[in-house]
Regions:
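Adenine-nucleotide phosphate-binding core of ATP-dependent small-molecule kinases
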Residues: 103-120
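Conserved beta-strand elements of the Class I
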Residues: 43-45
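Glycine-rich phosphate-binding loop plus the immediately following alpha-helix
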Residues: 3-38, 47-103, 107
């Protein structure tokens, strides 16, 4: 087996996308699928600064999409007007989290919905 670093493709949004090393982490899943002798399709979440969602079909990485979610969360949580003046806490308000999930699925785009957190 030889590992050729990096993958390039189009994500679900149609935008160009790349993997630079994360594909090696998927070797374990591909090996596990092979050991199970399954043709099961798998959808993997690879959380991190740049979260990757990967579709594996018939033992092959078919498509992946990278999101800016981890880095965006870190920057908003550290430097934005959304958190300025609020006390720091590791507590997760599950109701607020659920509301955020519901809001994220509404029309209008991410940025207006983020700003609406200030007015709620």
């Amino acid at each position: 087996m030889a590992i050729v670093p990096g993958l390039k493709g189009r994500g679900v949004s149609g935008c160009n996308d790349i993997m630079r090393g994360e594909e090696t982490q998927l070797l374990g899943i591909l090996d596990w699928l092979k050991s199970k002798a399954t043709e099961q399709d798998v959808f993997c979440c690879m959380p991190g600064t740049h979260c990757k969602w990967v579709r594996i079909e018939q033992g092959t990485i078919n498509q992946f999409s990278t999101t800016f979610s981890g880095e965006l969360f870190a920057n908003i949580n550290r430097d934005s007007s959304l958190v300025r003046g609020l006390p720091s806490s590791d507590h997760i308000d599950t109701e607020a989290f659920k509301l955020g999930l519901e809001t994220s699925q509404k029309q209008g785009g991410l940025l207006p919905h983020l700003f609406s957190a200030r007015s709620n």
